[in-house]
Amino acid sequence: MFETIKEEIQVVFERDPAARSVLETVLTCPGFQAILVHRFNHWLWNQKLFLLARLSAHLVRFLTGIEIHPGATIGRRFFIDHGMGIVIGETSEIGDDCSIYHGVTLGGTTWQKGKRHPTLENNVVVGAGAKILGPVTIGAGARIGCNAVVVKDIPMGATVVGVPGHIVVKKDDMDKTAQREAMAKRIGFDAYAERKDMQDPIQNALDSILDHMHKVDEELSEIKDRLKKP
């Protein structure tokens, strides 16, 4: 239990630049408080102490503005920033290392019992105000943009924006961006994040240079390997 608390606090420091001390985080961070109490509420729910779990969750909603149903399954190192207006439904499943921001809804689209809320795989980020509705699956490493409305499965590593949500960056594009950032770091240049909906001619030129440098590096490595052979 103490290891879990320590891990949750560490996540706040890693993902929230405003975090300054452990005491401040414990006393004033609503996301941390909501997640910590949810761990206990979920245990109560699994022990079939449904009323007690719901009452505790209701109190947390009153104090933090974050509504997490005690039946929701949440993985390790889950981070909630700001938190106000977040709703996480009963059959929601959230993997490890996910982050969500204020105003996010993981909601259902049916009155029928059973699986009716979203599944977020590992390393998913959901931006402020986004709505993910129904028993859809958001693939590992996906990014859901602010105020997007998602009602279908999203593949691993994709970036989604708009209403209804549509994919603007696929995993291959993400791999290329990561490659550029790694090259930029090597040469001491802090590249901006790539966004297809806001093209910057200077950034595009820099991206082309970084792509070319990467290609030259690969060719040089290939030449060196050939020269080493007898």
Enumerate the predicted regions with their spans:
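Structural signal for interior beta-strand "rungs" in well-ordered beta-sheet cores
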Residues: 61-168, 173
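Terminal amphipathic alpha-helical/low-complexity segments used for targeting or macromolecular assembly
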Residues: 1-59, 175-230
